[in-house]
């Protein structure tokens, strides 16, 4: 038997709030995965905890490709809605700023992953990709080192 509806307001007790976030985050990630499988949809989900920790899910393709696709789509939509050239210029700069900021955040996140940090939030497929990239990099480094030594 279900517990009934929960009133939608901030949970004041910090521990209860953290437990609820953890459980609901897991459920949300599971639902995103289910939608991607059942509906053959490309799904991406980004969640930041109140402490700023990133949790993400992306079906099939990597998050970077989905974000780039979203940016292109958003940019095209805004271009269609803003006929005034001054508004277009301001929108273009705003979009470029947002795009570059997102790219920097993505690079910083990738750098943390390469350093072995924040790995809890990425999928097994992304972990395998990361491992393959690191293996390839290590082979290049060893090859270059051997060239210099001989």
UniProtKB/Swiss-Prot annotation:
GO terms for biological process: cell differentiation; flower development; positive regulation of transcription by RNA polymerase II. It is found in: Nucleus. Keywords: Activator, Coiled coil, Developmental protein, Differentiation, DNA-binding, Flowering, Nucleus, Transcription, Transcription regulation. Gene3D superfamilies: Transcription factor, MADS-box. Residues 1-61 form the MADS-box domain. GO terms for cellular component: nucleus. The keyword Electron transport does not apply. This is a truncated version of CAULIFLOWER that may contribute to the 'cauliflower'-shaped floral meristem (curd). This trait has likely been selected by early farmers during the domestication of modified inflorescence structures. This is Truncated transcription factor CAULIFLOWER B. It comes from Brassica oleracea var. botrytis (Cauliflower). The gene is CAL-B.
């Amino acid at each position: 038997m279900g517990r009934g509806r929960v009133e939608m307001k901030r949970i004041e007790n910090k521990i209860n709030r953290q437990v609820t976030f953890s459980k609901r985050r897991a459920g949300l990630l599971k639902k995103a995965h289910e939608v991607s499988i059942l509906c053959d949809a490309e799904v991406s989900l980004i969640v930041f905890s109140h402490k700023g920790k990133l949790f993400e899910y992306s079906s099939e393709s990597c998050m970077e490709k989905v974000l780039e696709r979203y940016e292109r789509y958003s940019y095209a939509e805004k271009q269609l809605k803003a006929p005034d050239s001054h508004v277009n210029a301001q929108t273009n700069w705003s979009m470029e700023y947002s795009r570059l900021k997102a790219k920097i955040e993505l690079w910083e996140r990738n750098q943390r992953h390469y350093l072995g940090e924040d790995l809890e939030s990425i999928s097994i497929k992304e972990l395998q990709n990361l491992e393959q990239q690191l293996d390839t990099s290590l082979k290049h480094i060893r090859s270059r080192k051997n060239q210099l030594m001989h």
